[in-house]
Amino acid sequence: MFLVLASASVALAAAAPIHSADISHASQAYRADYRTESTIRFRQVESRFANRASLPVCRWQAELVVNRAVAAQGRAVAAVAKPIHRFAPLAGSHAGSCDAARSQISAEVARYSDARAAEATAVAQQDRAVLLNELDGIHALSVKG
């Protein structure tokens, strides 16, 4: 028996932020935007037997992450932009090729993301204190005295 593997990865980001916060810190105005991003990894496996036709199976795993992006005066502050929460991964398999199952898998991941929307928003709202601590650390390093 031989296995034929094909892998692919797709990232799906939410267009609008799930939460935004305006923060004033050390006489600087910051804008923090929080978005969810889904990444789906596909792996197509075909078992091949000498006397039978191959049977493709699409195995997939999706990860849902809440990302923070921060800007000051319209410029991104890369030092504090990062993923702040990862949800438990979602995985499954579909009979057939990954190309044929892609729309079904994307719909399942979208339902998973919608079901976690309230939790993602709550995580983003609770991040304010963490972000302020990170900005304090950056400010302490940049203050000359």
What is the role of each PLM region?
Residues 12-78:
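N-terminal secretory signal peptides
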Residues 1-12:
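Sec-dependent N-terminal signal peptides
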Residues 75-96:
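A short, surface-exposed beta-strand/turn
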Residues 42-43, 48, 83, 98, ...:
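A generic structural signal for ordered alpha-helices
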Residues 91-145:
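Compositionally biased, intrinsically disordered linkers/stalks adjacent to structured regions
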